[in-house]
UniProtKB/Swiss-Prot annotation:
Its cofactor is (R)-lipoate. GO terms for cellular component: cytosol; glycine cleavage complex. The glycine cleavage system is composed of four proteins: P, T, L and H. This is Glycine cleavage system H protein. The gene is gcvH. GO terms for biological process: glycine decarboxylation via glycine cleavage system. It comes from Sodalis glossinidius (strain morsitans).
Length: 131
């Protein structure tokens, strides 16, 4: 059973979102997603300063099994990326909710976060997938 921290918000496409304050949100992929993908070999992250709309593909996770698009959970501008993943993409596997974060985005509209799934709704969605 995947770990689904309650303090985070989630997307149906397995991204997590952490409110860091001042309209900045940290984004990564969930433990469930990294379990499905397997061992990460490369992370293609967005450029700092790039802007994305919610649901737009903005990064790629390459694992031993597949390359998978990562989607912007909310609209905004990329303000930071996790440079540690260049040398150590496996952090996405070993610490998906901490050291394996992908990027930080400054929201265009904070209210979009309210449309994301809470932990219970995300857990229900992955339970349904597993059936």
């Amino acid at each position: 059973m995947s770990n689904v921290p309650t303090e985070l918000k989630y997307t149906a496409s397995h991204e997590w979102v952490l409110n860091e304050g001042d309209g900045v949100y940290c984004v990564g992929i969930t433990e469930h997603a990294q379990e499905l993908l397997g061992d990460m070999v490369f992370m293609d992250l967005p450029e700092v300063g790039a802007t994305f709309s919610a649901g737009e593909d903005c990064a790629v996770a390459e694992s031993v099994k597949a390359a998978s698009d990562i989607y912007a959970p909310i609209s905004g501008e990329i303000v930071a990326v996790n440079d540690d993943l260049e040398a150590s993409p496996e952090l996405v596997n070993s610490a998906p909710y901490t050291d394996g974060w992908l990027f930080k985005i400054k929201a265009t509209d904070d209210s979009e976060v309210n449309e994301l799934l809470d932990a219970a709704a995300y857990q229900a969605a992955i339970d349904e997938e597993d059936e």
